[in-house]
Amino acid sequence: MQPVYIQRIASIHPQGNHSQENNPKVNDSPDVSANRPFLQACEPDYKDIIANATLRRRMSRIVKMGVACGLECMGELSPEKIEGIITATGLGCLVDTEKFLNNLLDNEERMLNPTPFIQSTFNTIGAQIALIHQIHAYNMTYVHRGLSFESALLDAMM
């Protein structure tokens, strides 16, 4: 098997968005984290990354974060050079899935808004990246808690 190299990474996390080399935001203010019982990610300005306002408005928070990281990783690559999009998630869009199922029960399976269902599927992040850049290549999402990252790496190596 040929050697495989990770060329770029991007992340959105509580300590700041370090994928943007020239403008990292660092959230080390004690005021910000002291009033919350949990850590909260320092999210980038999505307008700079996802230009389409309608698309951005319809995305859930987790989908925006995933798409932003994916687009940062792709950088200036042309869509023709991309051989595939492989995403991995531990729990996927669990909040959106819960929202959709609660709406399903509350409305007795009638008059459902399709947006929560569309956003609840685990392949939404990879699909949005492909749609934004018109990529018609291999697209796979792995969802299996701790094994999803390893599975995605093995898939990329094959």
Give the ranges of each region predicted by the language model.
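Short, surface-exposed recognition loops or helix-turn segments adjacent to catalytic cores
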Residues: 139-147
